[in-house]
Structure formats: C-alpha cells, structure tokens
Swiss-Prot record:
Its EC number is 3.1.-.-. Keywords: Cytoplasm, Hydrolase, Nuclease, Ribosome biogenesis. This is Putative pre-16S rRNA nuclease. Belongs to the YqgF nuclease family. SUPFAM superfamilies: Ribonuclease H-like. It comes from Pseudomonas syringae pv. syringae (strain B728a). It is found in: Cytoplasm. Could be a nuclease involved in processing of the 5'-end of pre-16S rRNA. GO terms for biological process: rRNA 5'-end processing. Transmembrane segments: none annotated. It is an enzyme of class 3 (hydrolase).
Length: 146
C-alpha cells in the first residue's frame, strides 16, 4: 500500500457531518467544515467538491461505539456511509473509534471561549472530526509518508 499523505476525517451524523483534514508531514489534524445532512444523507455534490479540492489519499470515518466497545445504533449507519464514500469516489476509507469525541469537542469549544448559542447553530462536529482523525493519525504512523 502506498503511504498516505493527506486524509479527511468525518464525524458522521444524521443532521450534520463534521469534516477535518490531516497531513502526514505534520501528523496533525484540524477542523475543516460542517456539512448538513438529511437523515444521514449529505449533499453528495458538496462531498465531491471537498474530495476534488483536497484530493485525500484516504478518509477516516468515526465509528460510534458504545462505552463497552460494542456497536451502537449508529455504527451500522456509519459503516454504510463509509462504504458509500468508497463506492462513489474510489477512495480508501478507514473507520476509527469515535467514543467521547463530541464530548471532548464541546470541552474544546468551551476552552476556546465558550459556546455561543446552541450546538445546532454552532456545531462542534468539525472539531469532533479533527479529534477522531488525530486519534487515527496517532495510532497509525506506519501508514503515513513522513
């Protein structure tokens, strides 16, 4: 397998999908944007635009597991979304345990100066995507081209 240089991270949700970008050279992930979704279905044209712009070597999708490590109700939907990304765009897709990333993202938002309004109006999904992608980068240095 070729070494990975640039990755997108996705925090999948039924109403919003957080997106982050990570680079092997820095080993760091950062938040990028939040996409709206209708019952878990994104605007695929916007997903295509992100892929065209960033040209990721792979995408990491958060896998929402229960605290005991078993699949949650959303796990199957996230895995189906991962397969659709691979099928539509031909990019390698990995899944990564995303337990507590939304909780951590809310804490990070508070540390940055607090939450302004509701999380619906000011979502933390892109922060959660960056956290899960950072976790994946930290756990898989052997796959990175550094």
């Amino acid at each position: 397998m070729a070494a990975l240089r640039l990755l997108l991270g996705i925090d999948y949700g039924t109403k919003q999908i957080g997106v982050a970008v990570g680079q092997a050279i820095t080993g760091q992930a950062r938040e990028l944007c939040t996409l709206k979704a209708q019952n878990g279905v994104p605007d695929w044209d916007k997903v295509q635009a992100l892929i065209n712009e960033w040209k990721p070597d792979a995408i990491v999708v958060g896998l929402p597991l229960n605290m005991d490590g078993t699949p949650s109700d959303m796990s199957a939907r996230a895995e189906k979304f991962s397969r659709k990304l691979n099928g539509r765009f031909g990019v390698t897709v990995y899944t990564h345990d995303e337990r507590l990333t939304t909780f951590e993202a809310k804490g990070e938002r508070m540390a940055r100066g607090g939450q302004k309004g509701s999380y619906r109006d000011n979502p933390v999904d892109a922060i959660a995507a960056a956290l899960l992608l950072q976790g994946w980068l930290d756990e898989h240095p052997e796959l990175l081209n550094v």
